[in-house]
UniProtKB/Swiss-Prot annotation:
Tissue expr: Expressed by the venom duct.
Keyword hit for Plastid: no
Propeptide intervals in chain numbering: 16-41
Domain comment (free text): The cysteine framework is V (CC-CC).
GO molecular function: ion channel regulator activity; toxin activity
Protein name as it appears in the record: Conotoxin vc5b
Lineage of source species: Eukaryota, Metazoa, Spiralia, Lophotrochozoa, Mollusca
Similarity comment: Belongs to the conotoxin T superfamily.
Gene source species: Conus victoriae (Queen Victoria cone)
Signal peptide: 1-15
Length: 55
């Protein structure tokens, strides 16, 4: 029983210190969203059906 309590109170993976190689995910998400919006705009200008309005 004591062993189970010790395991449950151990630090989780999220508690690890950040390293210099860690990259925040928010900028990556913003870049991906921006790229998809740009591709969608180019596609809609060229092909009416690919932006979902031609259905």
């Amino acid at each position: 029983v004591i062993l189970l309590l010790l395991i449950a109170s151990a630090p989780s993976v999220d508690a690890q210190p950040k390293t210099k190689d860690d990259v925040p995910l928010a900028p990556l998400h913003d870049n991906a969203k921006s790229a998809l919006q740009h591709l969608n705009q180019r596609c809609c200008q060229t092909f009416y059906w690919c932006c979902g309005q031609g259905k």
